[in-house]
Amino acid sequence: MGYKAAIPVEAVEIANLFAWSIVFHPLMKTLYLLRHAKSSWDDSELKDFERPLASRGIDDVPVMAARFQGRGGQVACIICSPANRAKSTAKLFAKNIEFDVEDIISNPELYFAGTQMFLKAASHVDETCDSAMLVGHNPAITEFGNAMANCDIDNIPTCGLVEMRLPIEHWNDIDTGTADLLEFDYPKKST
């Protein structure tokens, strides 16, 4: 006859509560950084701001959105650069995760932004949102991700996605060096 160790019910309840608090702690915010998808350089007459997505970029967005949802990703707010390629990426991503594209916020400061502008944009996220996604451009989005999580991502590729957990209750408490990097994914990453 086998021996079964008795585990006190209280210990199981505490362990379950601890596991739940890590995932759903109300004093945590989740920040996603999405670099715009691959853009087209076919029309040399277009200004940088107007460049559309390339066909590869259009194909990559649903793949990344599916991976995002497959990991249980949810976003309550999407803020993007007003550049055509960033807006198009945000809209395609939103459609693929059933986020209302009308709720996407265009922020001009995310075009040619630096870390401080990304930080400012994140600090103004609506308090009702526990998660937010910033859609922008390199090199700023990579620099911002590295500054937030004290990590060393060499380059967030086009349509690359970074997920970070922030130990804050209010978005205006966001600061560099305080995030935990949870995920770094991109289209060519083997799954």
Which stretches of residues belong to each language-model region?
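Charged phosphate-binding loop/patch that engages nucleotide di/tri-phosphates or the phosphate backbone
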Residues: 180-191
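Active-site-proximal alpha-helix that buttresses catalytic centers in soluble enzyme cores
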Residues: 29-30, 34-108, 151-156, 191
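Non-DNA-binding regulatory cores of transcription-related proteins
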Residues: 125-133, 138-160
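Domain-level recognition of soluble alpha/beta enzyme cores
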Residues: 151-182
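Short phosphate-binding loop-to-helix
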Residues: 110-124
